[in-house]
Structures are given as structure tokens and as C-alpha cells.
């Protein structure tokens, strides 16, 4: 019989000063939940969007290099190499969100997800990161849409055009064409959220 784990609220926690006991309890819980170093997970687009670094027993590499179509993970990590740490840089003034479209529960893999990170200054987007999950074998960064958003206010028109650019050239399979519309909606939602 398992005992439910209390829901954590990271917005109320000081994540810099977690106690050793809490870290060990969380590690045990996470070991029973799944693996975050797989490309289909919810966390991989977030790690790419936030410029995380993956530390292993032998090296450190950007998340974008670990989750890539160019190389297989078996080519990235040696058989005796383990992921030991994930560093996410703290960037002042960055608004980051993760939106996930799924049919059932939060434990489902995303049918489409979007990790977004924006830096705003005076109501203008200074920088943007848009990384999709669930639409490709690895997290899919949309740099053309990021460039388009830079220097613009988060308006309806800007959101529409960013969504169009983000999905430009998308070639869905016959039975998952809906993902294009869902992905466009997630981009629009992420941009318009900045107006609040």
C-alpha cells in the first residue's frame, strides 16, 4: 500500500535551501516516478527552453545537445556514465511556462506540449524560447518564431503570427494533423499570457 505524497508548491518554497532529508525523500519519490533523461518526458522541452545543463559522471552538456535527433543517446553517454545533476540557470525577469495537451491525466505523455520562456522589458518581448514536446522524436525548438517575437509587444496579432511561423512547414501524419492546430493554440496562449 502506498501513502500519498503531499503535493509540493515550488512557488512557496525556497528551492535553494532544501534540507538533506527533504532532498533524500524527494529523490526516493522521484526514483519511483520515472526517468527524466528520456526525450519523451515532459521535462525535456522545459530543460531545453531554460538552457539547462546536464551533468554526468564524465561531462557537462547543454540539454539541447542531449535531446537531439542528430545523435542517439547511446552515442551521447557511455555505458558506465550516469546523469548526476541538472543545472537550470536562474534568469531574473524571465517568465516561463509549460502547457500540456493530453486526453487523460497529468501522468500521460503530452500529445502536444510547449515550454516557453520570455524575458519582458517595458511590455516588449526582449527574448523568447519556444520548445514543443510530443510533436517530434525530441524537443523541437522554434527559433524563427522566437526571432519574430523579439522586440514585439504580446498582442493578438503578434500571437497569431508567432503561431503561424512556429508551425510553418509542419508535416503531420495522416492521423495526427490535429497537433498542428493544438500547437498553434499553445503558442498563442503562451504569448497572450504575457499581457496579464
What residues fall within each predicted segment?
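Ferredoxin-type iron-sulfur electron-transfer modules and their immediate structural context
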Residues: 1-44
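C-terminal structural segment of proteins
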Residues: 40-196
Amino acid at each position: 500500500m502506498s501513502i500519498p505524497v503531499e503535493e509540493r508548491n515550488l512557488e512557496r518554497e525556497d528551492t535553494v535551501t532544501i534540507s538533506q532529508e527533504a532532498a533524500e525523500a524527494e529523490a526516493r519519490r522521484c526514483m519511483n516516478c520515472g526517468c527524466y533523461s528520456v526525450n519523451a518526458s515532459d521535462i525535456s522541452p522545459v530543460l531545453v527552453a531554460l538552457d539547462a545543463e546536464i551533468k554526468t559522471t564524465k561531462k557537462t552538456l547543454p540539454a539541447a545537445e542531449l535531446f537531439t535527433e542528430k545523435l542517439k543517446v547511446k552515442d551521447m553517454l557511455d555505458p558506465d556514465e550516469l546523469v548526476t545533476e541538472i543545472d537550470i540557470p536562474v534568469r531574473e525577469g524571465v517568465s516561463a511556462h509549460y502547457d500540456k495537451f493530453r486526453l487523460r491525466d497529468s501522468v500521460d505523455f503530452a500529445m502536444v506540449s510547449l515550454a516557453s520562456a520570455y524575458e519582458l522589458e517595458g511590455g516588449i518581448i526582449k527574448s523568447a524560447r519556444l520548445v514543443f514536446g510530443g510533436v517530434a522524436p525530441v524537443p523541437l525548438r522554434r527559433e524563427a518564431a522566437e526571432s519574430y517575437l523579439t522586440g514585439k509587444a504580446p498582442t493578438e496579432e503578434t500571437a497569431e503570427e508567432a503561431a503561424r511561423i512556429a508551425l510553418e512547414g509542419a508535416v503531420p501524419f495522416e492521423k495526427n494533423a490535429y497537433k498542428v492546430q493544438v500547437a498553434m493554440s499553445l503558442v498563442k496562449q503562451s504569448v497572450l499570457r504575457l499581457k496579464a
